[in-house]
Structures are given as structure tokens and as C-alpha cells.
Amino acid sequence: MEIFVTGIGTDVGKTVAAAVITEALQADYWKPIQSGDFDFGDADRVKSYISNSKTVFHDNVYKFHTPASPHFAAEQENITIDITQIKRPKTKNSLVIEGAGGILVPLNEQHLVVDLIAPTDLVVVVSRHYLGSINHTLL
């Protein structure tokens, strides 16, 4: 089983949701693209919440110093994100995949985060609880 965790934006709680799912399923965790927080990224945060010994943390494919959307962070570092290089890790375990930013965040001039979601993925969309959040989530 592969679960893709995305959200309605940055800092909405994707990492906490991914950690809860990872721990509950004793699944592997993978964040293919990390922007900013180079010293203590999302994988490090998830590790701090995990107590099981079964979870494997797979390396980021792209990791940027600039705390921004992947396409902008890549541009600042003179890198082009090539989604053909973003290959899912091989594992017999369930895999929790955490997206970067929201579902329609650009990765490059042609691709968005949604393009990383496989047709067979279970998708979790993390939102917030406030007046108007249903509309923001459905947009």
C-alpha cells in the first residue's frame, strides 16, 4: 500500500499526519523533495515521532536550501527538477509519501506535485479547521 500525503498548503500539518500514518502502519517514509530546513527536515521530524523499529526512511531525491516551492528553490540553486528521476523506493513495506507544499505546487515548468501521485495511491489531503477551509480544500 502506498499513501500520498498532501495538503492545502505549507505548514498545514502534512508532516504530523504522515508521521501518525507511518507509525500506525509501521510503514516506510519518503519525502522525494525537501525545500528548506536542511539541518532538520521533515524526515527528521517524522523520525522524532516514530517509536517502531520497522520504518525505513528513504532519502530525498531533491533537497534544496531555499525554503520555497520546489520549482523556485530549484531555480535559485540552478537545478531543474526532472520527475523521471523521482523513482519510488523499492520496499515490501507500506510506503507513506509526503508531498511538498500543496497538491498544485509547481515542480518545474511542466509538472506539479499532483503528477507524483500514482493512480493506485491512497491520497490523504490535510486541511485546517477554520471558516472557509472546505472551500480552500476543494479548490
What annotation goes with each model-predicted range?
Residues V5-T6:
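Hydrophobic anchor at the beta1->P-loop junction of P-loop NTPases
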Residues D82-I83, L112:
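A diffuse structural propensity rather than consistent per-protein peaks
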Residues Q85-N108:
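Switch II (G3) loop of P-loop NTPases
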Residues E2, D11, V20-T22, G102-L139:
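Conserved catalytic-core segment of NTP-binding enzymes
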